[in-house]
Amino acid sequence: VRNRYWTLADEPVTGWPQQDTFVLKEGAVPVPALGQALTRTIYVSLDPYQLYYQRERTGPEGAPCHARTVSQIIESRMDGFAAGDFVFNTNGWTEYALMGEGVWRPGYMVPRKLDASVGRISQAVGVLGMLGLTAYAGMNLMASPQPNEIVVVSAASGGVGQIAGQLAKQRGARVIGIAGRDAKCKFVTDDLGFDACVSHLSPTLSADLAAVCQPGIDVYFENVGGKVFEAVLPLFNQAARMTICGLIAHYGDEDGGVDRRAALMKRGEPIFKTRDVRVMNLSVSEFAGQHEEMLAYLAPLVKAGKVKYREDIRQGLETIPTAFAEMLRGDSFGKMLVQVSPDPTLGARGPGKSRQGPFGTVA
């Protein structure tokens, strides 16, 4: 058995991913040392923050591109983990990887065993994982919407947005989504239960949003920036709150949008000051200690169908770069995942036919 994985090409990563950004390589399956476990990747989570890791070349040189993953242990020499266990870990864009002692990972992304009875194991990198924690922290712990307040969520059909809006509904707020094409807006209202949804593709976005946000916005969960923020800005009520989760509209900028939060603050400063708007930057790593609290709150809601969650699952390791680019462009529909090996909890159903997309080259 050989191991295939995607790594970065030698050229610096700027702007959006290009055809030659990633290279598919093949090597030996690693052997676990004492304190390590060998795992087979089942699901790879694709998220906007990974583009920053790629630009900064975070992690070991030549290693697989970073990603959060759901995996199964093949061989363990690591206390507390046994062969057959399902785990959350950070294998990245690869079929096999080690976890444990001496294996690089972001500090707060600690490997943990998964209980398949709590929810689908894929949810460990979605609604019951970092995305769920992001939504829970940003909405419940930071913005804290109250009954009958008006809450607006941008990228409302995305991995974080769909959860954040439903959490606000659970608290009795009136929730307005901002999404893209009509099918996404329909999903946000009909399936997720938002009170209304407007399209950022509309030439009358500002007027559309104002019409459904009377008498103004009390909470804004920001995932986008750009023209969406411009439409929201004049609608803030007195003492409103804004949680800045992401600014995906700027991730394709040559500088990666690194100064966009400062620019956004400067653009909004006159209204923020006169209307006493509280602006909060969300960094999910600061809430790692609330993971179990989030699970205790959110898992029962998901299991009971009170919080719904859509995944966009692509099939096969070869599709990862293309799926990643589509996610960044907003062409995905729900939380973007790639399944690279069979999920035994679903009757060992393996990934479907792979296709080589337009992004990435084979070494």
Please describe what each predicted stretch is.
Residues 28-46, 52-93:
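Glycine-rich beta-strand-centered segment in the early N-terminal region that forms part
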Residues 67-72, 83-155, 197, 306:
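NAD(P)H dinucleotide-binding glycine-rich loop of Rossmann-like/cofactor-binding domains
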Residues 86, 150, 174, 240-242, ...:
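Short glycine-centered segments of the SAM/dcSAM-binding site in methyltransferase folds
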Residues 125-203, 207:
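Mid-domain Rossmann-like dinucleotide-binding core that forms the NAD(H)/NADP(H) cofactor-binding site
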Residues 212-219:
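A glycine-rich helix->loop->beta "capping" turn
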Residues 227-307, 341-363:
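Glycine-rich phosphate-binding loop and adjacent beta-alpha segment
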Residues 329-334:
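Glycine/proline-rich active-site loop of Rossmann-fold NAD(P)-dependent oxidoreductases
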